[in-house]
């Protein structure tokens, strides 16, 4: 009788630990889904900076500012890459 009770309690404990670990894994995977948004924001900032710096460098060289072409649905306007 004691062995059966110990076996049942052990199985219950393992089940609880397994369920908790599965929930934590699911939460961490859900958090990772949001990460590309942050990466996209960083890319947007890089495009904005890249375009304005490119024009400033060309102006200093006594040349007309040829705006750097922005790719992927972006357009260079007023020394900044803007979403088209």
Swiss-Prot record:
Postsynaptic neurotoxin. It comes from the Eukaryota. The keyword Signal applies. Coiled coil: none annotated. Expressed by the venom gland. Residues 1-22 form the signal peptide. InterPro entries: Hwtx-2-like. Belongs to the neurotoxin 12 (Hwtx-2) family. 02 (Hwtx-2) subfamily. It holds the Pfam family Toxin_20. Disulfide bonds join 51-65, 55-76, 70-81. SUPFAM superfamilies: omega toxin-like (SSF57059). GO terms for cellular component: extracellular region; host cell postsynaptic membrane. This is U4-theraphotoxin-Hhn1a. Keywords: Disulfide bond, Neurotoxin, Postsynaptic neurotoxin, Secreted, Signal, Toxin. One of its GO terms (molecular function) is toxin activity. Residues 23-47 form a propeptide.
């Amino acid at each position: 009788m004691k062995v059966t009770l110990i076996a049942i309690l052990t199985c219950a404990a393992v089940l609880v630990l397994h369920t908790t670990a599965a929930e934590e894994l699911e939460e961490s995977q859900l958090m990772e889904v949001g990460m590309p948004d942050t990466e996209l924001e960083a890319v947007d900032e890089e495009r904005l900076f890249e375009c304005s710096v490119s024009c400033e460098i060309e102006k200093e060289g006594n040349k007309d500012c040829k705006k750097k072409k922005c790719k992927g649905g972006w357009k260079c306007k007023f020394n900044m890459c803007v979403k088209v």
